[in-house]
């Protein structure tokens, strides 16, 4: 079954909602953005997450020192890196790694040392999907996440189109820039059961 990552969480209530609804991954954004949290804030929230739900830290062009500090302070299970990636960034990290790839029309998939790839829209966090026809995932060495403009209305189609390891959502479960607990529940319900979640 396709796994679900709920990203950009910053409150106790949102974390608890995502966990209880069945999220497999919880994402904390450490890069500058409206969803950014500090290492200290994430460490507090991480204590609410059971061991079978994986904690992901999201970074843009980080140094290896930054990654190691966050892994240690927050207890991250994975790091997700956007932007520039040094050749040795993922070598011998104490946790798994995800390299984000912006799908911009050239169809290029990098030769990455990361454990997973994540395919995102050209502007991450914009709520806009990329053109799914521009991405060919045939023969990929790594399992991959699909992100970029996913929501409860299109996520089932995305899963049918790509058969990804996991799907990733942030703005698609927000209302007025804040995490919407009902949207989180409905999104996960659609992925896990292919239905709207309304009873």
Curated annotation (Swiss-Prot):
Pfam families: PRAI (PF00697). Keywords: Amino-acid biosynthesis, Aromatic amino acid biosynthesis, Isomerase, Tryptophan biosynthesis. One of its GO terms (molecular function) is phosphoribosylanthranilate isomerase activity. It is an enzyme of class 5 (isomerase). It catalyses: N-(5-phospho-beta-D-ribosyl)anthranilate = 1-(2-carboxyphenylamino)-1-deoxy-D-ribulose 5-phosphate. InterPro entries: Aldolase_TIM (IPR013785), PRAI_dom (IPR001240), RibuloseP-bd_barrel (IPR011060), TrpF_fam (IPR044643). It comes from the Bacteria. Pathway: Amino-acid biosynthesis; L-tryptophan biosynthesis; L-tryptophan from chorismate: step 3/5. CDD domains: PRAI (cd00405). Signal peptide: none annotated. Its EC number is 5.3.1.24. GO terms for biological process: L-tryptophan biosynthetic process. Belongs to the TrpF family. NCBIfam families: PRK01222.1-7. This is N-(5'-phosphoribosyl)anthranilate isomerase. It comes from Streptococcus pneumoniae serotype 19F (strain G54).
């Amino acid at each position: 079954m396709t796994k679900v990552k709920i990203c950009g969480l910053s409150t106790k209530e949102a974390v608890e909602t995502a966990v209880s609804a069945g999220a497999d991954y919880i994402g904390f954004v450490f890069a500058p953005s409206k969803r950014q949290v500090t290492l200290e804030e994430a460490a507090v929230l991480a204590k609410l997450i059971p061991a079978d739900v994986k904690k992901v830290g999201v970074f843009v062009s980080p140094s290896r020192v930054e990654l190691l500090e966050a892994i240690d302070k927050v207890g991250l299970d994975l790091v997700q890196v956007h932007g520039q990636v040094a050749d040795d960034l993922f070598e011998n990290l104490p946790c798994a790694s995800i390299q984000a790839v912006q799908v911009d029309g050239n169809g290029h998939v990098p030769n990455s040392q990361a454990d997973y790839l994540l395919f995102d829209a050209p502007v991450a966090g914009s709520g806009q999907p990329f053109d799914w026809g521009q991405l060919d995932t045939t023969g990929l060495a790594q399992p991959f996440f699909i992100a970029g403009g996913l929501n409860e209305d299109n996520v089932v189609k995305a899963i049918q189109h790509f058969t990804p390891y996991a799907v990733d959502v942030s703005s698609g479960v927000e209302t007025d820039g804040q995490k919407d607990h009902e949207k989180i529940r409905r999104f996960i319900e659609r992925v896990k059961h292919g239905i709207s979640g309304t009873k």
